């Protein structure tokens, strides 16, 4: 994770709770933090997309996730989003792939830049 304090950006190992600091996660940190949550919810597959996947995240970037699992329904997705936001201290945009139209721009973004951050078969 990166901590930003003024103009200096440093790698920080662990979590920082002081609200005056903002941070940008690297993908490996995101994977480590979300793994136990996805294990608990028994999610099959998750893609990271958007600014974090493109390595263009800023201090105010949210984290965009796409769940590829037909058994995760709306109420469970809402609860999952809350747990992820709490663990990451970031806004999360979470999508269920089955609810996105195939010809939509977001669908194309997910599959052109998406990075697997969780797969129940390999975690």
Q: Which residues fall in each region the model found?
A:
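Catalytic core of pol beta-like nucleotidyltransferases
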Residues: 2-45, 53-59, 70-123
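Short beta-strand->loop micro-motif that forms the acidic, two-metal-ion catalytic signature
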Residues: 64-67
């Amino acid at each position: 994770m990166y901590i930003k304090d003024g103009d200096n950006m440093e790698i920080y190992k662990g979590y920082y709770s002081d609200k005056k600091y903002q941070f940008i996660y690297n993908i490996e940190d995101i994977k480590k933090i979300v793994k136990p949550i996805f294990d608990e919810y028994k999610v099959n597959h998750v893609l990271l997309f958007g600014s974090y996947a493109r390595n263009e995240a800023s201090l105010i970037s949210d984290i965009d996730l796409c769940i590829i699992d037909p058994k995760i329904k709306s109420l469970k997705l809402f609860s999952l989003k809350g747990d992820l936001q709490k663990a990451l201290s970031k806004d999360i945009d979470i999508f269920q792939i089955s609810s996105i139209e195939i010809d939509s721009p977001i669908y194309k973004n997910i599959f052109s830049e998406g990075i697997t951050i969780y797969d129940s078969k390999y975690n």
